[in-house]
Regions:
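Basic/polar low-complexity intrinsically disordered segments
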Residues: 2-252
Length: 252
């Protein structure tokens, strides 16, 4: 008869006479899952005919489970590292794009104040005719939205015969804006890869946990009649991890 899902009882008492039970717990992290499987797979006694007691079907499931989880875990780390590294670069590009758009708008407002550009032209940029302050550009959506409007507005005004704004020119604004847009798209692709990696890991874990649980049940069942002082050591050699509750003595 197989041992229960999580707890293996140990016979020793605390000061109140309660039975103390070190308990096993299925791994909570992918690193712990991989370690549990690798410990078993690296144990030569797992495979020898004389020593083997684990069902071959379960052993044959353990190696693919380990390989798939390891591959998915490593791919997640690679994708996360790439996404994190790129985030540092995009911050600078965002700052540059925001600075050029903000400076362009400030020059535009000054030209309106001096009467060099009609107030009615502000609507070409998506602005109210009475606008005199730079709109909010500190969010990604705000910067992308206003950048597009400002570039389109300046081009429309120039087509109507207006004089171009300098320092910065709309060409400089457009260049930094386009670079930022490309970076945002790249970041989204990298984030999608991270999300895909997370989803693959999420889908793999239940099957891996099922294999580990089956293995641990068979291992504990095999050593169930041995005394605790040897039973736990044997089980640990096959990858089972035991925990003690707070203030419990680490006897075995």
């Amino acid at each position: 008869m197989f041992i229960g899902l999580f707890v293996l009882k140990v016979t020793f008492l605390n000061s109140r006479g309660d039975i103390q039970v070190p308990y096993r717990r299925l791994p909570k992290t992918d690193t712990a899952r991989l370690k549990a499987l690798k410990t078993l797979l690296d144990n030569n006694d797992t495979y020898t005919v004389r020593e083997r007691f684990i069902d071959w079907k379960t052993i044959n499931k353990a190696q693919p489970a380990y390989d798939k989880l390891l591959t998915a875990s490593e791919q997640y780390k690679v994708n996360l590292k790439a996404q994190t590294r790129f985030t540092g670069k995009i911050d600078k590009l965002q700052k540059n794009a925001m600075m050029y758009i903000s400076h362009f708008l400030q020059v535009l407002f000054l030209a309106v104040e001096r009467g060099e550009i009609k107030r009615s032209c502000l609507t070409l940029y998506g602005l109210d005719e009475e606008a005199s302050a730079v709109p909010h550009l500190k969010t990604i959506d705000g910067l992308l939205d206003w950048g597009q409007k400002i570039i389109a507005g300046e081009k429309a005004r120039l087509k109507q015969g207006g004089r171009p704004i300098y320092n910065p020119t709309i060409g400089m604004v457009s260049t930094h804006y386009d670079i930022y847009c490309e970076a945002i798209e790249r970041q989204r692709i990298l984030q999608d890869r991270v999300n895909d990696s997370i989803e693959k890991l999420r889908l793999l874990r239940p099957a891996v946990d099922e294999v580990i649980l089956d293995l641990w049940n068979q291992i504990e069942h095999h050593f169930v009649n041995e005394p605790p002082e040897t039973r736990f050591n044997h089980c640990r050699e096959y990858g089972i991890v035991y925990y003690y509750r707070r203030h419990e003595p680490h006897i075995y």
